[in-house]
Regions:
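N-terminal Rossmann-like or analogous alpha/beta NTP/dinucleotide-binding catalytic cores
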Residues: 2-131, 279, 283
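Short helix-capping/linker segments at secondary-structure and domain boundaries
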Residues: 99-103, 135-142, 241-249, 279
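Short catalytic-loop micro-motif centered on adjacent basic/acidic residues
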Residues: 76-79, 142, 221
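Basic/polar N-terminal segments that are highly enriched at the extreme N-terminus
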Residues: 1-2, 325
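Conserved nucleotide- and phosphate/pyrophosphate-binding catalytic cores
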Residues: 18, 149, 155-325
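Internal, conserved structured core segments that host functional sites
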Residues: 110-161, 165
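A generic structural motif
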Residues: 10, 141-142, 198
């Protein structure tokens, strides 16, 4: 079975845009691939500076993924920082990676343009990402179109290592481009993103979830008048309902005497129904953090055994003599 690897940054609370953009597809993949899913806590240090926030986010991300269906019996879930061989390999790869390659990174240039202070971690982010992928001989890496360049850089780094040391050591991973056709609009109509503060969080309390849904921006068409059915509420509603339900909502908008508030209530109910079992499961998992720790520890043991074997071979290739005691 081919191996799939995905990194999940604990950078904040997950929302329905994350779910339909990547999470759901990760879950669907686990029946067909040997899935490795790691919490990219080292990567998150390029943007998170508060220790308590990182700790809280890390547990929350694991809870979210377990709740929506990531199965530890099918997939391996682990912490990046629990496998120090990632950073060991990063150093080996750093010595054959041109600085110019890193400076041309779209993500790096975009963050600098936004005024984010440049530091070594931000610049060398793709080298650590390459190590994350290459150390497990990953066959595929599910990525969005905006992340494809990072995987291309991983392939470039792997090829350069293989060429420099005249070996066929690192497998060249293939991208599995995630379907982003269902771009989820946020409450303000832009793409849903934590950066825009326009998210709807599927695991929020019912009160908070209602506040988020009710904050969806609409026009000022009076209650009694027909409304354009191609609106934000309808677009989000379509993610949770079949075509018949979508057509029913459309007819209500066109008929008039159906307000946006009514539509938002129907959307809220759809979200609660869709994520009902996941919300219940998450509440149960919150009461059993020891189980969450167990899942992470077991995953880290498994992956570290693989990583140790790979890094030892890499050290031998570059001429490091290893343990002499």
């Amino acid at each position: 079975m081919k191996r799939s690897l995905s990194g999940i940054q604990p950078s904040g609370i997950l929302h329905i845009g994350n779910y339909f953009g990547a999470m759901k597809q990760f879950i669907d993949l686990q029946d067909d691939y040997d899935g490795f899913y790691f919490i990219a806590d080292y990567h998150s240090l390029t943007s998170l500076t508060k220790a308590e926030t990182l700790k809280e986010n890390t547990y929350n991300i694991v809870l979210d993924y377990l709740a929506i269906g990531l199965d530890p019996n099918k997939s391996t879930i682990f912490l990046q920082s629990n496998v120090p061989e990632h950073t060991e390999l990063t150093w080996l790869l750093s010595n054959i990676t041109p600085v110019g390659l890193l400076e041309r990174g779209h993500s790096y240039k975009d963050k600098i343009a936004k005024g984010i202070p440049s530091n070594t971690g931000l610049l060398t982010y793709p080298v650590l990402m390459a190590a994350d992928i290459l150390i497990y001989d990953s066959d595929i890496v599910p990525v969005g179109k905006d992340q494809k360049q990072h995987l291309e850089m991983t392939r470039d780094i792997a090829m350069k290592f293989n060429q420099q040391y005249e070996v066929e050591f690192f497998k060249l991973p293939e991208p599995l481009i995630l379907d982003d056709s269902a771009i989820v609009p946020g409450t303000d109509g832009q793409k849903m993103s934590k950066s825009y503060n326009n998210t709807i969080n599927m695991f929020a309390t019912k009160k908070k979830l209602k506040e988020q849904v009710m904050s969806i921006v609409t026009d000022s068409t009076p209650l009694e008048e027909p409304k354009n059915p191609d609106n934000n509420i309808a677009k989000i509603y379509a993610l949770f309902n079949n075509i018949d339900k979508q057509n029913e909502l459309k007819e209500k908008f066109l008929a008039g005497n159906f307000g946006y508030g009514h539509a938002k209530t129907e959307l809220l109910n759809s979200i609660l129904e869709y994520f009902g079992k996941a919300r219940e499961k998450r509440e149960e998992l919150e009461k059993d953090i020891d189980y969450v720790k167990y899942v992470l520890n077991e995953g880290s043991k498994k992956t570290r055994a693989i990583a140790i074997e790979k890094i030892n071979k890499a050290k031998e290739i570059v001429g490091l003599i290893g343990n002499i005691y």
